Amino acid sequence: MGREVSAGTQQEAKEGRCLLLALPCPALLGESRGPAPPRREYPTSEKFPGIPPPPSEYVLSVLQFTYPTLFQGWQTLVGGLLLHLSWKLGWVEINLCSRSEILSWLPASVLFVGIIYAGSRSLSRLPIPVFLTVHNAAEVITCGFQKFVQKEQTSHLKVCSVLFLLAAAVCLPLCDTQFDPSGYLWALIHLVCVGVYKVFHKLWKPGSLSDLDQQYINYVFSVVLLASASHPAGDLFSALDFPFLYFYRFHSSCCASGLLGFFLMLHTAKLKSSTTSGQYAAWSFLAKVITASLSPFFFAMTANVLTISCLVISGVGEALLVYTERTGT
């Protein structure tokens, strides 16, 4: 019986016949629940033996656990609990003495929720390289704010790199043979939230809050907000009908996703604090290149020459941006 259910799961994932809907959020956009498009397929274990899909993507796109308030709430809950435990054990240092500074950071926490929510909805419909191309265009908001609002001097090379990122993100939907309006809409919302988050972080003058302090506040706020939104969004009771609710693969993937997300956050925070901004930008760029390069081994992606050209242009634009950050030009 277990083998028949497992085989059925793989067949549905391969053929794109989703059992549930792709990350619904009627509370945010008034979007009706409908079947997710057969955007992506996961390779079978026979083709890539021993290489499982990333845990979060497996939960969202294969098992089709399409309840983002619950899934993102779970991830932030795990991250918050592990960060709190690390703090109490003395492994990390967190200082939350000033209530005024905590309150002043809450707008960024709202944007953080928007980033993870919109990002998860977009990633359930768009291939990872496409999503990263749109994500990179958030730098346009940051650079535009510096140049036109703060009147900072911006080098021609940096302007050129930002224009590359913008051109790639704008042209990509026009070249995409599997254009998904909902996926790109959520990617756009994610882009705006990331850009505004960076601008807020640049304007905000912290007195004592470190990156880990800020992340701790983000975790706590996200858990409270997402838990409160789970009932109005309809996710709380709808998840009870999830067909794989009691499957060990679902439980283990959720646990692995929460753990990996926390350790990635912790490593990123330590890397950011121990390197220069240019070095951190270079490592971040390398991580994106590796992620985009490995994603075809997990997800089938239909791309033509124009689509690949947009991805390359975005990569060139970010490489130039890293160069300007390292050289200070």
Language-model-derived ranges and their functions:
Residues 1-329:
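Polytopic endomembrane small-metabolite transporters, centered on the Drug/Metabolite Transporter
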